[in-house]
């Protein structure tokens, strides 16, 4: 089932050899395309092992692997635009928790997914790692209940956490 050119009109970055890498937070770079399988639930997961942002107080770099999982509805995020968007955090100064919530909010605004979760596993600084997790399920649907369940059971058993 090949996509029609009209379905890809909003996808401008994929295959573009003149990619402009932005060094400041740029949510406008995010692009979406239509989901051809709206009749079923399925997860899309992105693993982004090279996320970088800056500490808002010291300006020191913070490094993380970011996991973004979502159940799409009508729209899906285009992966190259997501890569460029995440790269735009390179010189953005914010706390880890804020970065994960900003990412989730921007993706909700772009796609209006049924469900989404964003998990950042930051490398230690000062001997402590921070792993913020945030999620969202569309209000009034089974996905809202799913979000509540996943949040209440997230990292419930520390002995089974293997993220380092």
Curated annotation (Swiss-Prot):
Provenance organism: Bacillus velezensis (strain DSM 23117 / BGSC 10A6 / LMG 26770 / FZB42)
Localization (cell): Cytoplasm
Broad class of where this protein is predominantly found: cytoplasm
E.C. number: 1.7.1.13
Swiss-Prot/TrEMBL catalytic activity: 7-aminomethyl-7-carbaguanine + 2 NADP(+) = 7-cyano-7-deazaguanine + 2 NADPH + 3 H(+)
Family annotation (InterPro entries): GTP-CH-I_C/QueF, NADPH_dep_7-cyano-7-deazaG_red, QueF, QueF_type1
Gene symbol of the encoding locus: queF
Pathway given in the UniProt record: tRNA modification; tRNA-queuosine biosynthesis
Enzyme class: oxidoreductase
Active site, UniProt feature: 55, 62
One Pfam assignment: QueF
Role description: Catalyzes the NADPH-dependent reduction of 7-cyano-7-deazaguanine (preQ0) to 7-aminomethyl-7-deazaguanine (preQ1).
GO molecular function annotation: preQ1 synthase activity
Protein name stated in the entry: NADPH-dependent 7-cyano-7-deazaguanine reductase
HAMAP family: QueF_type1 (MF_00818)
GO biological process, one term: queuosine biosynthetic process
């Amino acid at each position: 089932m090949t996509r029609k050119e009209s379905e890809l009109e909003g996808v401008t970055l994929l295959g573009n050899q003149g990619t402009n890498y932005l060094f400041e937070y740029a949510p406008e770079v995010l692009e979406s395309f239509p989901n051809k399988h709206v009749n079923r639930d399925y997860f899309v997961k992105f693993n982004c092992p090279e996320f970088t942002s800056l500490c808002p107080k010291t300006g020191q770099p913070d490094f993380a692997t970011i996991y973004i999982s979502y159940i799409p509805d009508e729209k899906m995020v285009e992966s190259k635009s997501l890569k460029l968007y995440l790269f735009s955090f390179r010189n953005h100064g914010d706390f880890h928790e804020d970065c994960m919530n900003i990412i989730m909010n921007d993706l909700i605004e772009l796609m209006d997914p049924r469900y989404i979760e964003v998990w950042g596993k930051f490398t230690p600084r000062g001997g402590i790692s921070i792993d913020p997790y945030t999620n969202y399920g569309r209000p009034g649907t089974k996905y809202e209940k799913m979000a509540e369940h996943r949040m209440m059971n997230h990292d419930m058993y520390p002995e089974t956490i293997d993220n380092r």
